UniProtKB/Swiss-Prot annotation:
Coiled coil: none
Lineage start: Bacteria, Bacillati, Bacillota, Clostridia, Eubacteriales
Keywords: Ribonucleoprotein, Ribosomal protein, RNA-binding, rRNA-binding
PANTHER family, per the entry: 40S RIBOSOMAL PROTEIN S15A
PROSITE patterns associated with the record: RIBOSOMAL_S8 (PS00053)
Claim: NAD is one of the keywords in the record: no
Protein name: Small ribosomal subunit protein uS8
Family: Belongs to the universal ribosomal protein uS8 family.
Length: 132
């Protein structure tokens, strides 16, 4: 079956694994997925990313992060711009997620960045997802 939205698939797998408190989740790898997971790693939402090849498709193994009392670090994760309805923002309209408690991942001309960096660098682009 052809996947129409691989980014939504990544976010859904992470959301579902996080909901049942799995330690790791595996997703097929792509450059955009690697960039999104690297942002999640830098922002402290996940523990580790490992890329491996199972012979057919390169995969990403994402280690999820939990707090001291096993509480979830990722409270919510939401796809914003979808293949059927793209969502863009200008440099002056970069969204804030929960007044700065979460991050928006934005695809800009400089690559994927979080909302803070887009505001600082004066960049707009496609709003891929919110994580909080």
């Amino acid at each position: 079956m052809v996947m129409t939205d691989p980014i939504a698939d990544l976010l859904t797998r992470v959301r579902n694994a996080n909901a049942v408190k799995h330690e790791v989740v595996e997703v097929p790898s792509s450059n955009v997925k690697k960039a999104i997971t690297n942002i999640l790693l830098q922002e402290g939402y996940i523990k580790n990313i490992e890329e491996y090849n199972d012979g057919v498709v390169p995969m990403l193994r994402i280690s999820l992060k939990y707090g001291a009392n096993n509480e979830r670090v990722i409270t919510g994760i939401k796809r914003i711009s979808k293949p059927g309805l793209r969502v863009y923002c200008k440099k002056d309209e970069v969204p804030k997620v929960l007044n700065g408690l979460g991050v928006a991942v934005i695809s800009t001309s400089k690559g994927l960045v979080v909302d803070r960096e887009a505001r600082k660098d004066g960049l707009g682009g496609e709003v891929l997802c919110y994580v909080w």
